[in-house]
Amino acid sequence: MALNLTTSRRALGSLKPLTRAAFVGARGYATAEPDLKATLREAIPAKRELLKKVKAHANKTIGEVKVENTLGGMRGLKAMVWEGSVLDANEGIRFHGRTIKDCQKELPKGKTGTEMLPEAMFWLLLTGQVPSTNQIRVFSRELAEKAQIPEFVAKMLDNFPKDLHPMTQFAMAVSALNYESKFAKAYEQGLNKADYWEPTFDDCISLLAKLPTIAAKIYQNSYRGGGALPAEVDLEQDWSYNFAAMLGKGGKENENFQDLLRLYLALHGDHEGGNVSAHATHLVGSALSDPFLSYSAGLQGLAGPLHGLAAQEVLRWILQMKEAIPAKYTEQDVNDYLWSTLNSGRVVPGYGHAVLRKPDPRFEALMDYAAARPEIAQDPVFQLVQKNSQIAPEVLKKHGKTKNPYPNVDSSSGVLFHHYGFHETLYYTATFGVSRGLGPLAQLVWDRALGLPIERPKSINLEGILKQVEGQ
């Protein structure tokens, strides 16, 4: 196992540590404002005091456990701490109290485009504060400077079978980055528990910086014949622009796609802590596994059909519908196709949510983005998604087997990638994996800063449940 072990380090010692990737741009951003680590350092004491106040109420109850919670995947249980976001069934997601629309208005934008930067969302998730544009320019540059991946990881990706699932490649590459983990090395040497957060922070920033590079290399190898990426990392550009450029969508002519990517990455970054990718990252991290191993676990959870594959399933279903109904379809044609899907025992993909009971604000944000751009609004596939969102809720209500008949974010994300020429649906989850690093990695830093313990819930067998509840 190539984990934290000294023997593993020796085994990999002969490999060159870093590729010497070329970077363009020379101008830095001088600022008297604190950088991200300094801002976080200032926030930690107050949060530790808050934890002490909460612990003073340790014997009080914040909920009850029903049999349906235990049998139903722990759904609805308040069982873990998650600082960055809170999901309300009726209001949707809030990031430190801010709605998506608030974030779109308040968070810094890129040098081009109008959408919030996902690295600004990370700053908000981690610190609870809205950064200045100058602070984010400095942070974007730091991410660009750390974007290169070790040479042995690049070679590993190059040697994978081209048809190996992108998420398998992604998880393995992220796990292998643990070879350079500052936290793992500091822990081996002995580290005060109060200081765990700092090398964890360093690892999280390093990983966040490298996620687009890994994902772009997977795309290049799997779908574009391998070889060098289409663009080098530009130190003057933001995280999303560089990801877009490495996917072959750099330059002024691709500004709309770059802005879509900013919005997509920011929207998908965090959605409370109970979803599989976030919880898996937290769970593995609670054992003091470093951020690379922890987020690799999150990526493997994200690869599951019930979690991160929904966007590709929606697109496939929409394209099948488009082929099955007339070119000049009516609302009745769409209605009939929806019923045929349900009557065949299948679900309508892209509708419903484990928590939400209203339309997903992330779906609305992406649809608003698309509707404001004529080239997308006129796309027949997008128009069909739009028509479905108007008709499907009533059909699902009549069907009566869903608590939330409204569209979720997956209804719109895949079709937008498809519009911009990304037709490789298996890859959509890898893009999700770049985004989802924002929330779980921010929380992982707080897990270490607050000294949260290893996760160890109590399990019970079915006989035990029955004995406990019979006669109640």
Curated annotation (Swiss-Prot):
InterPro entries: Citrate_synth-like_lrg_a-sub, Citrate_synth-like_sm_a-sub, Citrate_synthase, Citrate_synthase_AS, Citrate_synthase_sf. It catalyses: propanoyl-CoA + oxaloacetate + H2O = (2S,3S)-2-methylcitrate + CoA + H(+); oxaloacetate + acetyl-CoA + H2O = citrate + CoA + H(+). One of its GO terms (biological process) is carbohydrate metabolic process. It is an enzyme of class 2 (transferase). Optimum temperature is 49-54 degrees Celsius. Its EC number is 2.3.3.5, 2.3.3.16. The keyword Zinc does not apply. It is found in: Mitochondrion matrix. Its main location: mitochondrion. This is 2-methylcitrate synthase, mitochondrial. It comes from Fusarium solani.
